[in-house]
Amino acid sequence: MSQNLIRIATRKSPLAMWQAEFVKAELEKIHEGLTVELLPMSTKGDIILDTPLAKVGGKGLFVKELEVAMLEGLADIAVHSMKDVPVDFPEGLGLEVICEREDPRDAFVSNTYKTIEDLPQGAVVGTSSLRRQCQIRAARPDLVIKDLRGNVGTRLAKLDAGNYDAIILAAAGLKRLKLEERIASFISAEQSLPANGQGAVGIECRTDDARVKALLAPLEHAETRMRVTAERAMNTRLEGGCQVPIGAYAEIDGDTLSLRGLVGNPDGSQIITASSSGSTADAEKLGVALAEELLSKGAKTILDAVYANA
């Protein structure tokens, strides 16, 4: 492959394409003479749309095909939403870069209502995320939660067709697709703890590819890496995939990293929370320790039940 060419494996969804185009533009801006090509692909998570994600099962639903393309030499890098990236990588691949994080919050989207509090009793809310479901149900047990799959455009179309009174989406995706005007209100991390890595973009490549690693290096964002490292470490210790009722959110102030974690029963009947803070240098340790605290409070019982039903 040409020394002046990088090929990006990406999902075909508009949001995935935006992320790949963003990385392409950044690389071409930094490295004069570099050509970046996109290799759009369909993944298992994109193809199976009639089944709730929790039942499709497996970690890495949206990344496996992209990884095969890199291992076979068809692509040099893959660009992912960090919340979709499994903890373990196939031999020969690794997470080389985490770019600066966009807004990590969830967004409340409705054509009629401004906030979750405004929804009338029995209103229908669309989300396929068990993490969002458990937090909404805990706050508003009177609401009806209906599954919602598909890319951002498909989900908005289902809302507009009257299938739902409101839907919950990641704020970052709507902002990136220039759909911020669809957001009725942002849901604070206090109200809905985000997923680990939410709003951050990661770049995966072959671990032995020194040329590509050197080209990618300027895109690394140290603070985002520390925050996401803590969140992912917590998720890993809990053995969470991308479809679990787990929330994790880290913030940094100076050299101090504060981490909040949550595990909830999808029916909203029980929400277990914990928080801790420490040095940014200990991001991974903090994540593991917070997971241990959640487990000591009964998180394993909830997660075992979720996996048994999946």
From Swiss-Prot:
InterPro entries: HemC, Porphobilin_deaminase_cofac_BS, Porphobilin_deaminase_N, Porphobilinogen_deaminase_C, Porphobilinogen_deaminase_C_sf
Cofactors: dipyrromethane
PROSITE patterns in the record: PORPHOBILINOGEN_DEAM
Cofactor binding description: Binds 1 dipyrromethane group covalently.
BP terms from Gene Ontology: protoporphyrinogen IX biosynthetic process
Keywords: Porphyrin biosynthesis, Transferase
Any one Pfam family match given in the protein's UniProt record, by short name: Porphobil_deamC
The EC number(s) this enzyme carries: 2.5.1.61
Function, in words: Tetrapolymerization of the monopyrrole PBG into the hydroxymethylbilane pre-uroporphyrinogen in several discrete steps.
Note: The porphobilinogen subunits are added to the dipyrromethane group.
Self-association and partners: Monomer.
Homology family: Belongs to the HMBS family.
Protein name: Porphobilinogen deaminase
